[in-house]
Amino acid sequence: MLNMKSFALLMLFATLVGVTIAYDPNGKCGRQYGKCRAGQCCSQYGYCGSGSKYCAHNTPLSEIEPTAAGQCYRGRCSGGLCCSKYGYCGSGPAYCGLGMCQGSCLPDMPNHPAQIQARTEAAQAEAQAEAYNQANEAAQVEAYYQAQTQAQPQVEPAVTKAP
């Protein structure tokens, strides 16, 4: 375990050599502390965790401080965007999807554009897979019948001569 003095020295050293430590050992998050571990959200009070106390807060947009273009602040994004596990704001499965979101996640907002987009993309992928399976099955049936037709001996009808 690191004591505070060791931790401070480690942070100073990391800053001097240009290394950043991804996670705060005390579970804090936000601009000063960094991001939460995968699967966790940054609460409105700047602590990492999971569940509605951490992930379902509604920080007013005025409290979300501007950051570098497209980056999250305390696990939150303005404009209704999701904060990805990598600390960037956006919409769609890469930002809002299960296991991809660290904050401003939208599991309980089924009509949010990002959720609609994620469902639409999933439905399109499922429809494409179904169409492929049906086409593949039809091709297999056609090949089977062609093989059966070619394998059967051709019998010519008997020709009868008139007396």
UniProtKB/Swiss-Prot annotation:
Coiled coil: none annotated. It comes from the Eukaryota. The keyword Membrane does not apply. CDD domains: ChtBD1. Gene3D superfamilies: Endochitinase-like. Transmembrane segments: none annotated. Disulfide bonds join C29-C42, C36-C48, C41-C55, C72-C83, C77-C89, C82-C96, C101-C105. It holds the Pfam family Chitin_bind_1. Residues 58-67, 100-163 form a propeptide. Keywords: Antimicrobial, Chitin-binding, Disulfide bond, Signal. InterPro entries: Chitin-bd_1, Chitin-binding_1_CS, Endochitinase-like_sf. The keyword Cell cycle does not apply. GO terms for molecular function: chitin binding. Residues 1-22 form the signal peptide. Residues 26-66, 69-107 form the Chitin-binding type-1 domain. Induction: Weakly induced (up to 5-fold) by infection with phytopathogenic fungi like R.solanum, F.culmorum and B.cinerea. Expressed in roots, flowers, stem and leaves. This is Antimicrobial peptide 2.
